[in-house]
Design a protein with these regions (language model features):
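Cofactor-centric catalytic regions
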Residues: 65-120
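Proteins synthesized as precursors that undergo proteolytic processing into mature forms
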Residues: 1-87
């Protein structure tokens, strides 16, 4: 959870073993620092460095929606890159809710899983 200087309160999380902190850091960075809309912050392509639940390799795993030039460049730099499905469950499932200062609740859910954001 995070209480921001502008009055927003954000709760967010993900499942996904050792990938959880990577997913949560990406989600927070996209939404708070880069100003990406909440749902898009969760839906954008993900990466995972190392092993996570159900995975046996320590490679750099990228969802297939990354640009081919990006994937090629990472390989040129010596990374062991493994390209997964466009929306891979190996990247975990994330969700977030933001309460804005005016009381508006904004929710987002992961297209990699079944779920919905609902509030009242």
């Amino acid at each position: 959870a995070a209480r921001l200087n502008d009055g927003r309160v954000m709760v967010y999380g993900s499942m996904g073993g050792d990938g959880q902190p990577q997913t949560q850091a990406a989600l927070f960075t996209r939404y708070i620092l880069q100003g990406v809309p909440l749902q898009e912050s969760i839906s954008r392509p993900r990466w995972l460095l190392g092993r996570t639940w159900g995975q046996s390799s320590d490679s750099l795993k990228l969802e297939g929606r990354f640009a081919p030039a990006c994937i090629a460049r990472l390989r040129e730099l010596g990374h062991d890159v493994e390209v997964l499905a466009d929306f891979s469950e190996a990247m975990g499932h994330a969700g977030a809710i933001v309460r804005h200062p005016n009381g508006l609740l904004e929710g987002a859910t992961d297209p990699r899983s079944n779920g919905a954001a609902a509030g009242y």
